[in-house]
Structure formats: C-alpha cells, structure tokens
C-alpha cells in the first residue's frame, strides 16, 4: 500500500490521561503510509506538551496549537493542513488497532469512501488482541444506494474519506459546521456521501472506541443538545441538497429521517419543552423536506408528530413504559 497515504486528524483538548495511548497506537501503524495532524485546541493540561514531544520524536506527527474553538474548528484546521490522499478522524481519548493487514489493497484504487469496523470498550478495560482480522476489503457489486442502505455508520471514526471529495477547491471544500455540539460529524459525513461514487467496506476492526464514565450520550444534557442542535443540522442538510442539486435518494432519506426521529425521541424525554415551538420547527423542516423531493415519512410516529407533537409525546411515553424503558 505504498501509494495509500492517509492524514490522521486528531483534535486534542485536555486528554493527558489518554493521549499517549492514542498516539502510541498510531505510531505503530504499518499497513500504509500516514501523517498525524495533532490539533491542540487550547488545552490547559499537558496535552499540548505531549503532542510536541511526539512530533520531536517522529516527523510523521505534526502539531497545530490554537486557541480553544471547539472540536469542529480543530477538525477543520486539520483538514486545511492535511497532505494525504485520504482523511481519517481519530478522537484523542480512543486508539486504533495498528496490527491489521489488507490482503488485496488494489481494490482501494477505485474506492472513494471506506467503512470499517470498531470495537467499544469501557475505560480501564484491557484490550485483548483480535483474532482473524485479515482486513479483506469487500467492494460489493451493489449500487451506491443499495450499499449505503445496507451499511450505515454513526461514528465517523470508522471511515476513510477520500480527500478529493472533501477538498474539491477552496470554495467547494467540506468543513465541519461551527456552533453545534451534536450531529456535526453526521452532517459532514452525509454531505461527503452525496459526492462519493464508490463506497467500500473493509472487513477489519481498525478502531477502539472508549466508553468513559461521565461521557454518556443519553443523559438529559445530551438530549437537550439534540433538541437544540439537530434542527439546525437537518436544516443545513436540506439546504445543502438544494444548493448541490442532490437527488432525494433512499439512502439519504433514511439517514435524515433517523435524525428527525432522534430529535423527537430526545424532546419527548426532556422536561419543560416548548411544544408549540417544537411543533412549528418540525412542520417547517418537514415542509422543506417535501420541497426537496423527499417522500413524506411513512413512520406513523413521524406523521403523528407532524399533526401534534403533544400527542406524539403521550404515545411515546406510553410505549416506553410498556417496554420498561422509562
């Protein structure tokens, strides 16, 4: 894989406890050529010094120090500095599996979006070596739509992005939207998917995703972020479809519908929601959705929310109680 050069972008902010483990795993990567761009986003602990230390030891590590501006700004800084043909976003409290092998790397010549597997582990859990991970790349004979309907990815760390589609030119380059705390990674991914033509799947576990106590994504704070930010993300995606003349294909319809459902589910579990304002937002987004040529959602819950958010909340709470979830 001498011709496969990837830029690994690592946003860093106050992760001194985990950072060395992350960078050590990257330094052991031998399957292809790489550079690692470490973006220190104004860390107040020793994370910035650790980044500099690794850059002095290995020229493949490059460091950018910037004032704290958030993870999206850090990723964008990494994108601007990237020299590789491919892009891989790695979180600084996670690690990668450097021991995988790819038996038929030539298939990558035609791919422009590569999905692979990840494993989740709890903080403090010892990672055991993986067996039978030969990394055989499977480029199926499915159409792009069929492939993307079959294989979904909610973690952008499980993806290689072809830089060609990310950085077409200065005016058309993709970037992470600023000002939102959830969904910006999916927004970036879906926009990229509207451009790519040859998605592929790598049959290997390349990424280790750490589950940290206190970083849960289903607490009330996270649900409130969903309530506030997902409407913005959905709105930007619909505007992107309009500006880029994106066809309303099933794979994209399915993904945006999931965002709608996540928004409604989160809102139903948050206390003190302004139901009137939420209903107005949902109706406006669904109207914009229809104007872009997407079929009106078949989901009975989505239809109910369009008629009455309050009725949706009541039905959803009854359903959750029956399931013993809430």
Each PLM stretch: what is its role?
Residues 10, 33-42, 62-67, 91-92:
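Short beta-strand/loop segment that forms part of the nucleotide-sugar
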Residues 71, 92-200, 207-225:
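Donor-binding/catalytic cores of nucleotide-activated saccharide
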Residues 24-33:
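Short, acidic, metal-binding catalytic loop of nucleotide-sugar glycosyltransferases
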Residues 204-213, 218-248, 262-290:
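Catalytic core of nucleotide-sugar-dependent glycosyltransferases
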